Amino acid sequence: MNCPVRGALANRESALNVGIDRFWAPLAMLATQDIALRLQFRRSMVLNPEHLPHHGPVLLAPTHRARWDALLLPMAAGRRISGRDCRFMVTTTEMCGVQGWFLQRLGCFPVDQGRPSMTTLRLAIDLLADGQQLVVFPEGQIQRNDQPIQLRQGLVRLAQL
């Protein structure tokens, strides 16, 4: 699938400064956390939220078992709990079309899993250096089995830095 997201990574500085759109982020929280998640799960509880840092770099690497993960994580570790937004590294295919338009405004940025670039890794490093909260699903895709996860090289490199 051809999707014009590579150009968005060319200027890392703008990706750092744009961040989370002030208009779309509250609407996304309302739609996901207050409506969709409550309808789907009725009740949710975050255990030990005091363990989430409120400042400084945070790298979250949760397992990815369902599409709900990307909605549940900001509810469990995002703005309402930690006072911070989650910046997701997502696949290039996720950043296409209307969905990609919204994801970009919510602070997501793409990684081409077939040909990961140093630019993407550098942006992730820059976000962490800026004290932001970065989310990377270590499997790189939804895994619905009970097998041990295979970490992608980029996450390993990122965690080592």
Predicted regions and their residues:
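Soluble, non-transmembrane catalytic domains of enzymes that act on hydrophobic metabolites at membranes
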Residues: 1-8
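Soluble catalytic domains of membrane acyltransferases
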Residues: 21-22, 39-161
